[in-house]
Each structure stands twice: as C-alpha cells, then as structure tokens.
C-alpha cells in the first residue's frame, strides 16, 4: 500500500523537476538574489529623489517603457532592456557628483542580478505598455515588482 504512494510521490517529484518547477533551494536562491536587486533599485530611487529641483525636472522629461504585465521573473528582460537608457539619464544628472561611482556600481549589480534571475531564456520578448513613465515611476514599478515576487516566495 505504501509502495504505491511512494512511487506516486517519486513520479510527481520527477515530473516537477523535469518541468523546471521551482524547488525549495531555487526559491531560497531567488529570494537571496531579489534582495540586493531591490536594494539597488531603492538606492537609485533615493538618488533620483535627492536631486535638486532643476535636475529632477530635467530627468523627468526622459521616458521609460514598462511591460504591459510584469508578473514573472522572465519579465526582468524588460528591465534589462531599459537599463542602458536609465544609466544614461542618471549619468547626465550626476555629471559633477561624487555619487557617480555608487550609481555605476548599482547599475552593474542590477545588470548581473537580472541576468542571473531571468535565466538563460532568450526567446522571451517584452510587450511594452503604450504609455511611457518617468524615471521615478519606472523605479517605483520595478521595486513593486520585486517586492511582489519576493512576497510570493515567503
């Protein structure tokens, strides 16, 4: 009687692993990777909000694209595609500021973390929303995305 249950359990486990269902260790790893990504995005938002009014108003003229529906880690591809424009906007505003190194470090961290989190899937293409967002909205939405993913893993 127990053999049948054990065999069913083994078969189910193999089916889940074969279909790349997240395992407990991969969930823990993902959570560990999401934490620094979230912190880096929050740091950038803090830096943006610390600019003088003139610089912030200039930064708000640049527009960014958000995916129509970001609910899975694969949607981080959309963030990755907008990292270069984000870095250019932050560099423009930081031209004479000492925080430039910290921003570059955060951007590099975000790039590496997003690459690891989204995995090797290359066939995914982003479907962007028709409306663009400001740099503040962009960072806030990605922070919310990370928090949402993180909360589903706890």
From Swiss-Prot:
Sites carrying sugar chains: 23
Residues annotated as signal peptide: 1-20
Matching SMART domains: IL2
Origin: domain of life: Eukaryota
Annotated disulfide bonds: 78-126
Segments passing through the bilayer: none
Coarse class of the protein's main subcellular location: secreted
Subcellular localization: Secreted
Molecular-function GO terms, alphabetical: cytokine activity; growth factor activity; interleukin-2 receptor binding
Xref: Pfam families: IL2 (PF00715)
Cellular component, GO, one term: extracellular space
Gene Ontology terms: biological process: adaptive immune response
Keywords per UniProt: Adaptive immunity, Cytokine, Disulfide bond, Glycoprotein, Growth factor, Immunity, Secreted, Signal
Function summary: Cytokine produced by activated CD4-positive helper T-cells and to a lesser extend activated CD8-positive T-cells and natural killer (NK) cells that plays pivotal roles in the immune response and tolerance. Binds to a receptor complex composed of either the high-affinity trimeric IL-2R (IL2RA/CD25, IL2RB/CD122 and IL2RG/CD132) or the low-affinity dimeric IL-2R (IL2RB and IL2RG). Interaction with the receptor leads to oligomerization and conformation changes in the IL-2R subunits resulting in downstream signaling starting with phosphorylation of JAK1 and JAK3.
Family membership: Belongs to the IL-2 family.
Protein name as it appears in the record: Interleukin-2
Organism: Lama glama (Llama)
Organism classification: Eukaryota, Metazoa, Chordata, Craniata, Vertebrata
Gene: IL2
């Amino acid at each position: 009687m127990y053999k049948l249950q054990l065999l069913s359990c083994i078969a189910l486990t193999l089916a889940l692993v074969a279909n790349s269902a997240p395992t407990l260790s991969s969930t823990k790893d993902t959570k560990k990777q999401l934490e620094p990504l979230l912190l880096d995005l929050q740091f950038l938002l803090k830096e943006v909000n610390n600019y003088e009014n003139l610089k912030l108003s200039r930064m708000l003229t640049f527009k960014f694209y958000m995916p129509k529906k970001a609910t899975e880690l694969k949607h981080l591809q959309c963030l990755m595609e907008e990292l270069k424009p984000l870095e250019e906007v932050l560099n423009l505003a930081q031209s004479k500021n000492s925080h430039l190194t910290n921003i570059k470090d955060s951007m590099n961290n975000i790039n590496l973390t997003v690459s690891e989190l989204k995995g090797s899937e290359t066939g995914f293409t982003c479907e962007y929303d028709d409306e663009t967002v400001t740099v503040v909205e962009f960072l806030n939405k990605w922070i919310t995305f990370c928090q949402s993913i993180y909360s589903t893993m706890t």
